[in-house]
Amino acid sequence: MVPRVPQPGIWCPAVTFFDSKTDTLDLASQERYYAYLARSGLTGLVILGTNAEAFLLTREERAQLIATARKAVGPDFPIMAGVGAHSTRQVLEHINDASVAGANYVLVLPPAYFGKATTPPVIKSFFDDVSCQSPLPVVIYNFPGVCNGIDLDSDMITTIARKNPNVVGVKLTCASVGKITRLAATLPPAAFSVFGGQSDFLIGGLSVGSAGCIAAFANVFPKTVSKIYELYKAGKVDQAMELHRKAALAESPCKSGIATTKYAAAIFSAKAAGIEDAEEKLRPRKPYDPPSEAAKQEVRKVMAEVAAIEAGLS
């Protein structure tokens, strides 16, 4: 049975495959990819995260991806489902769909479409309503970059978590190690998991008490990111730091957006998973463009060393 609180380690917010001719989900490739990631040392998968292009998917497609993931990884591998939307009602619909489709946890962005109206009382009320009605444990998702600049501070997250026992964690894509420090010092890890939202500050987060990270770069090199975590937790800090620095430099092209992340996944992890025509299938969904040839060349150049390391990991 999957624990009530998300377990420490590396979670991967998996990218989404499309049939570029019909602009529909490629579920066969998706299933193969999920299965590969689950064999790569990861603690769990996040389905419908930001890098899955969740806001570009229909409600039916969202449910299909969760169900496909559950089929691919079996009954016991942890799945967290992104359920972000603009209203409480929409979020609750997505949560119920996720529960039926086989998710274990839900990852919830704050409402933020009307930025000025999204006051602290509104945010607290939203998470109260969602957590009380959700059949699945709730993980707060703090990502100001996709939420009109709404940035939940550690005091607000603590208040929400203490009031609502069904809130069991947070993903901090705000990249604040200070928040990780305060939350880890305030909320017990048995009841609340604090995850960094990017792998390039993984060791910084672990050093102050994080549970690990939910890392888009784990789409590209899942074994490498998992190895950094493994080395650090085993007390091999120098080895962990050496690998971490290489991975952080390799990740730099992904900072330009979803297109480069998906391209990197196509030529590395999807290739390792045996998925044909992955570059075409991992183009961003319309209306967004694939990366330029210059960006592709940069990915191949900057990631070459870590690609060789990944290939040598079991």
Swiss-Prot record:
One Pfam family, short name: DHDPS
Chain residues that bind substrate: T50, N51
MF (Gene Ontology): (4S)-4-hydroxy-2-oxoglutarate aldolase activity; (R,S)-4-hydroxy-2-oxoglutarate aldolase activity; 4-hydroxy-tetrahydrodipicolinate synthase activity
Record flagged with keyword Lyase: yes
Catalysed reactions, semicolon-separated: (4S)-4-hydroxy-2-oxoglutarate = glyoxylate + pyruvate; (4R)-4-hydroxy-2-oxoglutarate = glyoxylate + pyruvate
EC number of the protein: 4.1.3.16
Database matches in SUPFAM superfamilies: Aldolase
Family assignment from sequence similarity: Belongs to the DapA family.
Task of the protein: May catalyze the final step in the metabolic pathway of hydroxyproline.
Name of the protein in question: Putative 4-hydroxy-2-oxoglutarate aldolase, mitochondrial
Organism from which the protein derives: Coccidioides immitis (strain RS) (Valley fever fungus)
